[in-house]
Design a protein with these regions (language model features):
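Gly/Ser/Thr-rich helix-start
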Residues: 11-12, 43-45, 54-57, 86, ...
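Short N-terminal helix-initiation segments at or just after the protein's N-terminus
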Residues: 79-81, 108-117, 156, 183-191
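Phosphate/pyrophosphate- and phosphate-bearing ligand-binding catalytic cores of soluble enzymes
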Residues: 3-9, 47, 138-294
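A gly/ser-rich beta-alpha-beta helix-loop segment of oxidoreductase catalytic cores
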Residues: 89-98, 104-133, 139, 205
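Basic, gly/Ser/Thr/Pro-rich low-complexity segments located predominantly at protein N termini
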Residues: 15-16, 47-49, 89-90, 113-120, ...
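Structural signature of FAD isoalloxazine-binding scaffolds in flavoprotein oxidoreductases
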Residues: 10, 18-22, 48-66, 118-148, ...
């Protein structure tokens, strides 16, 4: 999995699947053994696969589920339908070029629409689900459904199904306010300049590791505890942005997870604040999905 996640670390998966289209994906899921762990993967950010690998099926969305188109407007709003495999920056540019506004922040998200939906990705004041009209999901039987925000518990970097079924996002319909293309493109350029200046984009990383606690910033707390530069093996708390853990070259998933645990324990003991992971960790020495617990 190291080649497929942005941390460039982690063990092997039992099965890889690149669906040709949604029908192909439905047939694949329907044919899986009951209880087979399934991991949907876009660009591989926000994810750590343990060194023992993932004992299940990894489904890649970025090749097949990449359609994007403008739909009939909702009043003055631009409506865009995008597949789960569409990179978030691509969606941001599409919205701008079609006269929409409010998606500029997505230019700084290093993931896909599917990943953004799954965690309510956001930055620079924007959040994914603020723009969602509806989503399309697929379950283990290959059944595709249309759902709305009412079907989910949505919060800061948190999305949970209210109906309890195991489903994955395959696309969404978004609505955006009217905007100006030139202004939107300029705003995206400015955000990207800011991102390059403040984040360690020259080294493998997964994006922000921890959620910001209410009224504070994880990076500030980590830096206050003197943890910038702390390392285990080749995994290091970035000296450029404390809420990033970088792979200096050859880091194992265990190295990265050890840094995460040390940061959480240190911040908790010194400040009383319990940092909650934003990144998902899957697998184990035996390859069993660890889920998304903090």
């Amino acid at each position: 999995m190291a080649r497929h996640v942005t941390w460039r670390a982690g063990g092997r998966a039992r099965t890889f699947f690149h669906p040709a289209d949604l029908d192909d994906l439905a047939a694949f899921l329907a044919g899986l053994p009951g209880g087979e762990p399934v991991l949907f993967l876009g660009l591989g950010s926000n994810l750590l696969v343990r060194d023992g690998g993932f004992a299940g099926a990894v489904v890649f969305t970025h090749r097949a589920l990449k359609g994007i188109e403008a739909a009939p407007p909702l009043g003055p709003k631009l409506v865009v339908v995008a597949g789960a495999g569409v990179p978030a920056p691509h969606l941001a540019r599409f919205v701008a070029r079609h006269g929409g506004g409010g998606a500029e922040w997505m230019a700084g998200v290093p993931g896909t629409v599917g990943g953004a939906l799954a965690m309510n990705a956001g930055c620079y004041g924007g959040e994914t689900w603020k723009h969602v009209v509806s989503v399309r999901t697929i379950d283990r039987r290959g059944t595709v459904r249309t759902r709305t925000a009412a079907d989910y518990e949505i919060g800061y970097r948190h999305v949970a199904s209210r109906h309890g079924a195991e489903e994955w996002f395959v696309g969404a319909t978004f609505a955006f306010d009217a905007g100006d293309e030139a202004a939107a493109m300029a705003a995206m350029k400015a955000l990207l300049v800011k991102r390059v200046a403040s984040q360690p984009l020259n080294l493998p990383n997964a994006g922000s590791v921890f959620r910001n606690p209410p009224g504070d910033h994880a990076a500030r707390l980590i830096e206050t505890c003197g943890l910038k530069g702390f390392a285990v093996g080749a995994a290091q708390v970035s000296t450029k942005h404390a809420n990033f853990i970088v792979n200096l070259g050859g880091a194992s998933a265990a190295d990265i997870e050890s840094v995460i645990a040390h940061v959480q324990a240190t911040v908790k003991s010194r400040t009383g604040v319990e940092l909650v992971r934003e990144v998902r960790i899957v697998g184990s020495a035996g390859g069993v999905d660890a889920g998304a617990a903090p």
